[in-house]
């Protein structure tokens, strides 16, 4: 007589909520796709639409003469031309809007695979929900601009940076290659995305310095490859910097603008202003509690781990303490540091040279910012 053993897959409440957030996020992405089927655009989007009507050579020439790198426009032109090839008579605006939604589907894949395996599906679901639904971000999901792609490239570079520094990673060099490629893609997409990637590289350097100083040579290799990969655009960048130094449209910053950065990150856009203020305060307090609390627990857990190891009982470390010890929480804190670094760079450049920073230039680093919250 054969007895059939029925295996039951147990899903914790936290994981179930993570999958729920994934489903909600997918529904929001589907809604974003539905919103693409409109020809309504504003001035900056009109610039993109006009740019992709040119050949690739002209497009690169015009972006070099302006203040933008060319990758986003090339990607958008390729997709729009492909749509027109498959569907003769198709317009330009709708396919261009769809291009802006595509990066979030890539982040969906990262959430249910890469993030789920290394952190949890709860972390993946919370991250994806945040980068789609948190203040400011929904407005740029379908906008015909480069911010969604810049956010994808910076976030992916940051994720693979964790693969580089994680002691449990089996193929750190593959993650290093992905870091270089995504970093270059970010630098060729938007300049403050390039700044964000520089902050990611500083994080990797700090992690190597802390873990194994011999790996700093590996970090130097990644940096050298990135510089070589960006050489073709350096002359155009130098001309653009010279142009911006002489004249640019951005208004001067004040120290009150730092508060504006927090409002940009946390303040919703409901019709009730008092409600927006209350929600912004609650969200800010929640973010500080989650990220700050995880750092405090890390310090306590790390100290306890060292005491146990010094006593010769490393085998009794709890799994949570191992996770803290392997740098998960520090990686989460580094996500916040990436955004802070972008803001500090923007303010420093604006005060020392001329104003070059507006709040939306934080968008490329906001994936790292909300990943920090999800990890915490």
Place the predicted regions along the sequence by residue.
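Short, Lys/Arg-rich, polar N-terminal cytosolic tail immediately upstream
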Residues: 1-14, 316
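N-terminal leader/targeting segments
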Residues: 1-4, 165, 169
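Membrane-proximal helix-loop-helix interfaces that form the catalytic/acceptor-binding platform
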Residues: 16, 21-166, 173-376
């Amino acid at each position: 007589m054969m007895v059939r053993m029925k295996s039951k897959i147990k899903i914790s409440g936290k994981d179930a909520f993570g999958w729920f957030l994934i489903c909600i996020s997918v529904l929001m992405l589907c809604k974003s796709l539905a919103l693409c089927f409109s020809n309504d655009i504003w001035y900056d989007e009109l610039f993109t639409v006009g740019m992709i009507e040119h050949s690739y050579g002209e497009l690169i020439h015009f972006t070099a003469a302006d203040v933008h790198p060319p990758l986003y426009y090339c990607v958008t032109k390729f997709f729009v031309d492909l749509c027109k090839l498959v569907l003769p008579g198709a317009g330009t605006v709708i396919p261009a809007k769809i291009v802006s939604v595509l990066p979030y589907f890539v982040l969906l894949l990262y959430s249910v695979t890469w993030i789920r395996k290394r952190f949890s599906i709860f972390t993946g679901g919370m991250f994806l929900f945040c980068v789609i639904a948190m203040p400011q971000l929904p407005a740029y999901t379908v906008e015909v601009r480069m911010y969604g792609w810049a956010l994808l490239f910076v976030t992916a570079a940051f994720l693979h940076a964790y693969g580089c520094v994680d002691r449990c990673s089996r193929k750190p060099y593959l993650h290093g290659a992905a870091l270089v490629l995504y970093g270059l893609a970010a630098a060729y997409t938007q300049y403050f995305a390039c700044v964000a990637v520089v902050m990611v590289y500083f994080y990797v350097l700090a992690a190597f310095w802390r873990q194994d100083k011999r790996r700093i040579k590996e970090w130097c290799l990644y940096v050298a490859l990135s510089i070589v990969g960006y050489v073709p655009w350096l002359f155009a960048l130098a001309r653009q910097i010279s142009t911006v130094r002489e004249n640019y449209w951005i208004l001067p910053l004040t120290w009150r603008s730092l508060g504006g950065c927090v409002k940009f990150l946390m303040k919703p856009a409901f019709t009730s202003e008092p409600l927006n203020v209350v929600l912004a305060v609650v969200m800010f307090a929640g973010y500080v509690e989650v990220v700050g609390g995880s750092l405090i627990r890390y310090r306590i857990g790390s100290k306890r781990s060292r005491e146990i190891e010094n006593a010769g009982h490393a085998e009794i470390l709890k799994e949570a303490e191992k996770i803290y010890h392997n740098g998960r929480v520090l990686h989460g804190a580094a996500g916040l540091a990436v955004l802070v670094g972008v803001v500090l760079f923007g303010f420093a450049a604006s005060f020392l040279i001329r104003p070059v920073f507006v709040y939306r230039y934080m968008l490329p680093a906001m994936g790292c910012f909300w990943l920090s919250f999800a990890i915490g």
